[in-house]
């Protein structure tokens, strides 16, 4: 939240021609089928090339071929600034929202995987948008996917 991951995903989606699925989309899919679990929805989406943001997809899809897990991070102040702009909030409001969201994400990830959210061992690549910038992060991923012929 506030790292720019959704912006990177959108840029990749446009350049690679693959859809992006986020929390809202996955929750919408669950509403349509009361028997489906979130993991089943994510596995179904991953049968075709796509980008899945969050939702423990790194753990759910860890044994699937052609899955590449990326963790996008940024300095706390950069994240707060992005949230302030996107949500039209004060610094304190954005900071509170960020801290609440991070705590919820960490709890959700641990409850569903037994692992620590953000642990580098759960991902193939870590990208820091504070250091690299959003466009450079997207370019790094595109170059990598071209090199390993995923695209």
Where are these regions (language model features)?
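Glycine-rich phosphate-binding P-loop
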Residues: 1-12
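Post-Walker A helix-loop "phosphate-sensing" segment adjacent to the P-loop in P-loop NTPases
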Residues: 13-21
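Conserved beta-strand scaffold positions in the cores of enzyme catalytic domains, especially
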Residues: 20, 67-69, 124-126
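ATP-dependent small-molecule kinase phosphotransfer cores
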Residues: 24-49, 56
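Small-molecule kinase domains that catalyze NTP-dependent phosphoryl transfer to phosphate-bearing small molecules
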Residues: 36, 90-135
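ATP-dependent NMP and nucleoside kinases share a basic, alpha-helical "lid"
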Residues: 44-87
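Short amphipathic C-terminal alpha-helix that caps PH/PH-like domains
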Residues: 138-145
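C-terminal helical "lid" subdomain and adjoining coupling/linker elements of P-loop NTPases
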Residues: 148-151
